[in-house]
Every structure is written in C-alpha cells, then in structure tokens.
C-alpha cells in the first residue's frame, strides 16, 4: 500500500511552507489542501482538535501537528534521502535552537513592523492635513 500524505495549510503561512518544503526536499508526493482559517474545515478540526491550526501533516490517516515537529517527522520517516538536519547532535541542537528562535521572534517582529507602518501612515496623513491647512491660510 502506498503512503498517503496530505498537508493542510495556507499559502501565506511560513509554517505551512516549512512543511511543504521539507516534503519537496525529500521527494515525497503529497496532496495539499488550502485551509480557510476563518471557516475551519471539518478535516482540520478532526486532525488537530487541540489547537485547531495549521499546518497539519496527515500521513496514512495519522496527523502530525506543529511545523517543527512535522519537519522532524518527515526527516525521520523518509530518511533514505537528503537529511534535513545535521548528523552531529550539537549541530542538530543548534539548528533546532535557531528554528525555535525564529518561530518565537518572527511573529513579534512582524507585529511590530505592522504597527510601525500603521503609525507611519497616520503620521503622514496628519502631516498632509496640516500642510494643506497651512497652505490655505
């Protein structure tokens, strides 16, 4: 029986893309199902009932959740080609450290960047309004 591999994710999610890239690196064929995060599918709710979030890797009807855990699972399951992690335990731990660091800091940085852009837009709008007032005096 051939393996069935399904990834539940969204195109814009770096976490979904992490899982998909790992599968591509390993040469694993899979079916991709785009999720609507506002109206979560019964499939997502069935296979990730705890967190109800993406990505989810479904391998032979068994779900694996959380992108770093999915990548580790992919590396261990399809271990005949292209290791995703270094062979040396220290280097592997180091790679996991940086992956975890990025997972924890990236959303924070993105949030700060979006807030900066929002404030900048408000500030520029106010400057434009004030300049218009001064021109009309």
Task: Annotate each PLM feature.
Residues 1-134:
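GST-like domain detector, emphasizing the conserved glutathione-binding G-site
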């Amino acid at each position: 029986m051939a393996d069935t591999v399904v990834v539940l994710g969204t195109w814009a999610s770096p976490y979904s893309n992490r899982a998909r890239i790992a599968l591509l690196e390993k040469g694993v064929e899979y079916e991709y199902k785009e999720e609507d995060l506002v109206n979560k599918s019964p499939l997502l709710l069935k296979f990730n009932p705890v967190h109800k979030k993406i990505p989810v890797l479904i391998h032979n009807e068994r779900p694996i959740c959380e992108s770093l855990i999915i990548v580790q699972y992919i590396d261990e399951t399809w271990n005949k080609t292209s290791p995703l992690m270094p062979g040396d335990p220290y280097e592997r731990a180091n790679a996991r450290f940086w992956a975890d660091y990025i997972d924890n800091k990236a959303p924070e940085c993105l949030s700060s960047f979006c807030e900066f852009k929002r404030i900048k837009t408000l500030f520029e709008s106010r400057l434009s309004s004030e300049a218009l007032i001064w021109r009309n005096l």
